[in-house]
Amino acid sequence: MGRFLFVSFGLLVVFLSLSGTAADCPSDWSSHEGHCYKFFQQKMNWADAERFCSEQAKGGHLVSFQSDGETDFVVNLVTEKIQSTDLYAWIGLRVQNKEKQCSSKWSDGSSVSYENVVGRTVKKCFALEKEQEFFVWINIYCGQQNPFVCKSPPP
């Protein structure tokens, strides 16, 4: 009996410690690798979406990607939530200089160390594209109204 209680208590401690990592995000946000993510269906231009993300959570920005795993997670989130008529979802990358080069930083200030860009053009903002199953980033007009994904550190 004592051994059973010890094992049960040990499992409870493990469960509570593991569930605590996901519980760090607000209940309507998703957790992945120490960050919180939320897809917002309302459509905004890039600048308004970035501002909105910063108002939703401390340290919040349009989503940045640091790995294939993070991209896969966000693509699944977008695919589950986006309306069938929407073609794009904003991400936190835009062209920031006169030479039409991508900024070396995401809107959250992190370095662009992982890239999945298709078709660089003179348009300045990037979005995930439905035609490519949201796996690639495409340059589109920043004033376009699109849904978006916010990313933040846990509160």
Curated annotation (Swiss-Prot):
Expression sites (tissue/organ): Expressed by the venom gland.
Location of the C-type lectin domain: 32-151
Keyword Signal listed: yes
PROSITE patterns linked to this entry: C_TYPE_LECTIN_1, C_TYPE_LECTIN_2
Signal peptide: 1-23
InterPro entries, per the entry: C-type_lectin-like (IPR001304), C-type_lectin-like/link_sf (IPR016186), C-type_lectin/snaclec_domain (IPR050111), C-type_lectin_CS (IPR018378), CTDL_fold (IPR016187)
GO CC annotations on file: extracellular region
Disulphide bonds in the chain: C25-C36, C53-C150, C125-C142
Localization (cell): Secreted
Pfam family, one: Lectin_C
UniProt cross-references to Gene3D superfamilies, sorted A to Z: Mannose-Binding Protein A, subunit A
Keywords: Blood coagulation cascade inhibiting toxin, Disulfide bond, Hemostasis impairing toxin, Platelet aggregation inhibiting toxin, Secreted, Signal, Toxin
GO molecular function term, any single one: toxin activity
Family designation: Belongs to the snaclec family.
Function comment: This potent antithrombotic agent acts in a calcium-independent manner. Exerts its anticoagulant effect by two distinct mechanisms. It binds to activated thrombin through exosite 1, blocking fibrinogen clotting, platelet activation, factor V activation and other effects, and it interacts with prothrombin (F2), decreasing its proteolytic activation -especially in the presence of factor Va. In vivo, intravenous injection before thrombosis induction causes a significant decrease in thrombus weight.
Quaternary structure note: Heterodimer of subunits alpha and beta; disulfide-linked.
Name of the protein in question: Snaclec bothrojaracin subunit alpha
Lineage: Eukaryota, Metazoa, Chordata, Craniata, Vertebrata
